[in-house]
Amino acid sequence: MKKMTKSNSDASGSLFSSKLFDENRFYDCFLKDLNNAKEEVIIESPFISTKRMKLLVPIFKKLAKRKIKVYIITRRPEEHVEEYRWQSEKAIRMFEVMGIQPLLCVGNHHRKLAIIDREILWEGSLNILSQIKSREIMRRIEGEHFALEMFDFLKLEKFL
C-alpha cells in the first residue's frame, strides 16, 4: 500500500501537512521529531512502561542536555493497577532526575498526544510512553495552527 502525505492549507491559509502512522512506523518518525526539537516537547500519555522507556530515555537525556523543556503529562501512579504503578513511579522519579517536568493528572486521563515546539502535533490512540504490542494509529500534523489549537484547547498555558 502506498504511503500518502496530505498537504493542505488551513482556514487561515497557512500550509500544513498530515500523515498517518501505525505502531510499527510511529517511533522512527517521532524520535526524529524529538531529535529536531528546538525549545519544547510536551507528551501526554496516560501509561508508562519500563520497556518503552528503554527506547525513550536516551533521547530524553539528550533533550535535557540541550536545555529543551520537556513536559510529561500522565496519570498519577495511584490510578494504575499494581503492574503499571511501579513502572510509572520509577519513570516519574527518572524524569525528575533528568530535569523533565512530570504533570500528574487525576480522573480517567486517557489522551495520547505530543506537541513539539508548538509546531508539530501528534495525536491518536498510541500511548507514547508505554506502547509495546497493541495495534495503534497516530497522525502527525505539521502546522503551527493545529499545534497551538491543541495547546490552547488543553489549557496548557496554566501548567507550563
What are these regions (language model features)?
Residues C29:
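Short acidic active-site motifs
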Residues K112-I115, R139:
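Short beta-strand scaffold segments in enzyme catalytic cores
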Residues K3-N24, I42-I48:
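Acidic/glycine-enriched edge-of-secondary-structure segments
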Residues M1-N8, S18, I120-L160:
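Signature of lipid phosphatidyltransferase scaffolds
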Residues L20-D22, P102-V106:
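Short acidic-hydrophobic, aromatic-tinged amphipathic segments that line or gate anion-handling sites
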Residues A37-K38, H110, R118:
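Short, well-ordered alpha-helix to beta-strand connector turns
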Residues C105-N108, I132:
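Short solvent-exposed loop/turn micro-motifs enriched in small/polar/acidic residues
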